Regions:
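Residue at a conserved register position within TPR or TPR-like alpha-solenoid repeats
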Residues: 41, 87-88, 122, 172, ...
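Solenoid-like repeat scaffolds
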Residues: 26, 71-73, 103-110, 141, ...
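"A position-specific structural signal for the A-helix of alpha-solenoid helical repeats
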Residues: 36, 83, 117, 124, ...
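TPR/TPR-like (Sel1-like) alpha-helical repeat modules
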Residues: 123, 129-143, 172-191, 261-272, ...
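Residue-level recognition of tetratricopeptide repeat
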Residues: 30-33, 76-78, 111, 145, ...
Length: 427
């Protein structure tokens, strides 16, 4: 430990991890020691325990072995459960942490972050409604904590609190619960102060949080709400880029392709500017990658509306590839799976087999999400596979049980009047 943090903490982290290995060897039956040992090892490789294909990194097994040993001794160990969720959420078997995730919120009901934590597993296993509910409870716990403790911790106020709102908005949107997604997206935006938006090194994350209502409105085809949004301040480059993206989607959705193309041009000019690219990152990914996905998606949607599918589909395939290459984080740094737009275009051009493959792959990433199930059902119907389509319809019925909007088609829900925006006090 050093009172002044060094520019490179690696030597200190390595010394601490080696010291904790020695302590674990002395106290192998103490679950707290085992959890602290795992935590020390995790800090050597933060958020880097699994490759994109789910293969474990060379150091991962030592970490999970320590945590599992701690949980074998004490299945209710809060620290070990917290670490276990983070250690396996990006794996191909996140469900192994599910029994522990199910109990964590009740073990620590006043700690907002821990109440929220099960959502990291629920998102991966398709329990979107449970994720939404946990994050709603987490925001209540956060409100209690800040009221009692009057916390002025920037990390807590600017990171953990909006993260819970953001996560809940994401899963509410996946499950088709528009009113709650609106509420949670607004809460995400409202958690960010002007000071956070102007803070060097944090402005990208802050702007991503503030953009959440736009992303949710795109998901639910709330085109009029998007077009009613005022232009963000000139210095909020990522937020302005997403504003142009959302407006482009809205104009395209309403059939005004000339205006949609104008918004695409403005998006491209802004995202390729030196000032925007100097922001470097948003969330855990490069701003270049995230905004290129926005451009490719909007362009692909416009071209699809013009029935220029031979041009649209390659752009959407490129968007999928970039989306798949993004560094893992939850919620993902790109809100709308590009595969949903790609599958819709493939169906429109008559390539139902390719659309089936697209939606099946999406469902592997986001299990039982209703948006992809709707597309998969259409793909089976287009291929004359009525029995398979009926099976998927049953799954879609279950996936949409908590929704407050009509069942989606492959491209989303039909454009309609927006769901009413609830006040936060109505939760």
């Amino acid at each position: 430990y050093q009172s002044t943090a060094p520019a490179d903490p690696t030597p200190l982290n390595e010394a601490w991890a080696n010291a904790m290995r020695d302590v674990v060897a002395q106290f192998p039956n103490d679950p707290h020691i085992l959890a602290l040992g795992a935590d020390a090892l995790m800090n050597l490789h933060p958020w880097d325990f699994w490759l994109a294909d789910g293969t474990s990194q060379p150091w991962t097994t030592e970490i999970t072995d320590l945590i599992e040993a701690a949980l074998e001794i004490d299945p209710d160990n809060i620290g070990a459960i917290h670490l276990y969720i983070h250690a396996v959420e990006a794996s191909t078997t996140p469900e192994r942490a599910e029994p522990y995730a199910d109990k964590l919120a009740d073990l620590s009901p006043n700690a907002g972050h821990l109440v929220h934590m099960p959502a990291h597993i629920y998102l991966r296993v398709g329990r979107y409604h449970d994720s939404t509910l946990n994050n709603m409870k987490a925001t209540d716990a956060d409100s209690w904590f800040t009221g009692v403790c009057r916390s002025n911790s920037f990390i807590y106020l600017g990171g953990y609190i909006p993260h819970n709102w953001h996560f809940g908005a994401t899963t509410a949107a996946i499950e088709g619960w528009q009113a709650q997604a609106n509420l949670l997206a607004d809460g995400t935006k409202n958690a960010i102060t002007p000071q956070m938006l102007s803070m060097a090194g944090f402005t990208g994350n802050a702007q991503q949080f503030v953009a959440q209502p736009l992303f949710v409105d795109v998901r639910f085809s709330a085109w009029d709400d998007i077009l009613a949004e005022p232009e963000p301040a000139m210095d909020l480059l990522f937020l302005r880029s997403i504003w142009h993206y959302a407006r482009g989607r809205a104009f395209e959705g309403k059939g005004d392709l000339a205006q949609a193309k104008d918004e695409l041009a403005k998006l491209d000019t802004l995202r390729l500017s030196d000032e925007t690219r100097a922001m470097k990152s948003v969330g855990r990914n490069s701003i270049d990658a995230v905004l290129e996905i926005a451009s490719l998606t909007l362009n692909g949607e416009i071209l699809s509306s013009e029935a220029r599918y031979d041009e649209a589909i390659p752009l959407l395939i490129k968007g999928v590839a970039i989306e798949d290459s993004l560094i893992y984080t939850e919620p993902p740094d790109w809100f709308h799976p590009v595969r949903h737009s790609l599958g819709e275009a493939q169906l429109a051009v008559g390539d139902a087999s390719a659309a089936e493959s697209t939606y099946v792959t999406d469902l592997k990433k986001w299990p039982e999400n209703g948006w992809a199930l709707a597309g998969l059902k259409e793909a089976y119907m287009a291929q004359g596979e009525a029995e398979e389509a009926n099976k998927v319809q049953e799954r879609l019925n279950e996936a949409w049980v908590n929704a407050d909007v009509p069942m989606p088609t492959s491209g989303g829900i039909p454009f309609a009047e927006s769901a009413p925006k609830m006040e936060l006090t109505e939760r």
